[in-house]
Each structure stands twice: as C-alpha cells, then as structure tokens.
Amino acid sequence: MQRLGATLLCLLLAAAVPTAPAPAPTATSAPVKPGPALSYPQEEATLNEMFREVEELMEDTQHKLRSAVEEMEAEEAAAKASSEVNLANLPPSYHNETNTDTKVGNNTIHVHREIHKITNNQTGQMVFSETVITSVGDEEGRRSHECIIDEDCGPSMYCQFASFQYTCQPCRGQRMLCTRDSECCGDQLCVWGHCTKMATRGSNGTICDNQRDCQPGLCCAFQRGLLFPVCTPLPVEGELCHDPASRLLDLITWELEPDGALDRCPCASGLLCQPHSHSLVYVCKPTFVGSRDQDGEILLPREVPDEYEVGSFMEEVRQELEDLERSLTEEMALREPAAAAAALLGGEEI
C-alpha cells in the first residue's frame, strides 16, 4: 500500500512540473547539411581566392622573366661598350678580373669586368677579349628601364643602353657613328662604324656575325678601331692574312664555331698566306712559278693547304688511325702462324 502511494505521488509530481517544448527540428537538433542553393556562396568565395592566387603567381613569374631579360640585355650591351683599354701597353699574356659596386641614389650598380689577352709567340697573332657584366637595381632589387628592345620604342627611335639604363633615342643621321644597324633607321646601315645610305647587307664594311653573312670575295673579320666584326675584302699580295696552319688561336676562339669571325681574312684566290721574310708576320704571296719574294727567292708553286676546309684536320687524324689499325692487324696475322708452329714443335719434344 505504501509502495502504491509513493508511485502515485511521483506521477503527480511529474505531471505538475512544466516541461519545455520540444525543440524545432531546425533549431537545436543535429545540424542538417545545407542544400545546394546554400553552398554556392561558399564555393564562389573559394574559387575567387584560387583565381586571385593564380593571378599573383603569374604576375610574379612575369616580373622574374622581365628582370631576367633586362639583365641579359644589359650584359650584352655593356659588353659592346668601349673599354678604353690600350692593347699595346698590356703584356703578351694578360688576365684580369674586377668587381665594383657604385651607389647612385637608391640604385646599386654592380659591374664585373674580365680582360684576357693571349698572344701566339710563333705567329704573333693576338686574341683580346673583354667581358663586362652590369647589374642595376634599387633597394628592393627591381630594375626600371624605358625599353628592352628596339621595338619597344616608337618609329625613328631605337633602344640604347647608356649610364646603366635603357632609354629610347632618336635614330642617328647619315655619317654619324654607330655600333649596330638598328641605330641607323630607315634605309641606312652601319658601314665601317658610320650610318650610310644605299648600302646592302653583306657588302664591304657591313656588320656580320659569321662568314655566311658576307658576299663572295669578302670575309667576316674584326678590324682595328671597331668593336664588332665587319665584312672585309680578302687581302691581296703583300697584305696581312690569316694563317690556317696556326691552330692555337683557332682552338681557343673559333674551333667551336668554324664559320665565326676571324682576326684576319684568308688570302684571295691565287695567293697563299706565308711568313713575311724571317718575321712572325704572315702576308699573302703568289703561288705560281717564277714569282720572287723580297729576298729574291723563287716561290715554288704550292697547293692551298687543306686547313681552309672545315673538318680536314679531323679527316687526317682519322686516316692516320685507320692506317695504324691496318698495320697492327697485318702484324698480328703474320705472328699467328709462327706461334702455331712453335706450339707444335713444343708438343713433339714433350
């Protein structure tokens, strides 16, 4: 009876206590996945961030590429600048490297300069090279130039590298000094270092990079007073010439590019590059019978050396190796019968 009364009392108390209403299914219950319509704003924000990162990456890449192009152009233009070095005062063999840093406002100019001079003691031929690498940057390492190539400037303008910066300059007039054809706009070309009208590429005095750039009867060679090679007439009798038998300078300079510019041109047809008297200078001399040199000696006919032909030296070396291999094979063939006979005689004695 007491247990039944206690149970009824508990039921009455439970009924009397106010109960909170059941929560709405969308208020405090477990979170429900939003539908597709609710997810669009979040996905759109994520895509925008991704596109923004891609744009920043592309801008950074373009800036790095632009800086690299500007630096390469600066190095090439600085290498063509006048060095004002007196070659006569340098020793026959000379090597020097210098590094300088100059502060100009917020910019720092770094210049790396290398000078090399090599002289062949036998022929007297000389090779002089100068490399100037220039880097210009502000405190943040950025470079600012008005132009990079000639096409960046307007008509009748060209891109010039001066004072460690690129600027657009008006084209130079006729007979003015020049170092490349783009400085002489219009129908002008840079001929023997001066802007000239009515000139054709590959003619006498025009700028060249290799032998294929010059017309027949001319060769691409460096000239005193010019910092670039030009198409030069082949030397005639008594003029200085390029001796192909001197391989030292060829291996140092032009072996990797057989058609590149030379220090001197080979002789014209019918002439041969020979030592002048007893000196180390080579000049063009006739190759036919009856001609005499300055000492009164008769010049016998000689064929033009094969060194003028590209790859002839390697062909000679290959031929010598083949002859040596053939002689070794024949010697081994002669020794084999003798060795067999000796083996038979040795077996009978045993």
Curated annotation (Swiss-Prot):
GO terms for molecular function: co-receptor binding; receptor antagonist activity. The lineage of its organism: Eukaryota, Metazoa, Chordata, Craniata, Vertebrata. GO terms for cellular component: extracellular space. Residues 40-84 form a coiled coil. It is found in: Secreted. N- and O-glycosylated. Residues 1-21 form the signal peptide. The keyword DNA repair does not apply. Residues 147-195 are annotated as: DKK-type Cys-1. Interacts with LRP5 and LRP6. Antagonizes canonical Wnt signaling by inhibiting LRP5/6 interaction with Wnt and by forming a ternary complex with the transmembrane protein KREMEN that promotes internalization of LRP5/6. DKKs play an important role in vertebrate development, where they locally inhibit Wnt regulated processes such as antero-posterior axial patterning, limb development, somitogenesis and eye formation. In the adult, Dkks are implicated in bone formation and bone disease, cancer and Alzheimer disease. Belongs to the dickkopf family. The C-terminal cysteine-rich domain mediates interaction with LRP5 and LRP6. This is Dickkopf-related protein 3. It comes from Homo sapiens. Highest expression in heart, brain, and spinal cord. Keywords: Coiled coil, Developmental protein, Disulfide bond, Glycoprotein, Secreted, Signal, Wnt signaling pathway. Residues 208-284 are annotated as: DKK-type Cys-2. GO terms for biological process: adrenal gland development; anatomical structure morphogenesis; negative regulation of aldosterone biosynthetic process; negative regulation of anti-Mullerian hormone signaling pathway; negative regulation of canonical Wnt signaling pathway; negative regulation of cortisol biosynthetic process; negative regulation of DNA-templated transcription; regulation of transforming growth factor beta receptor signaling pathway.
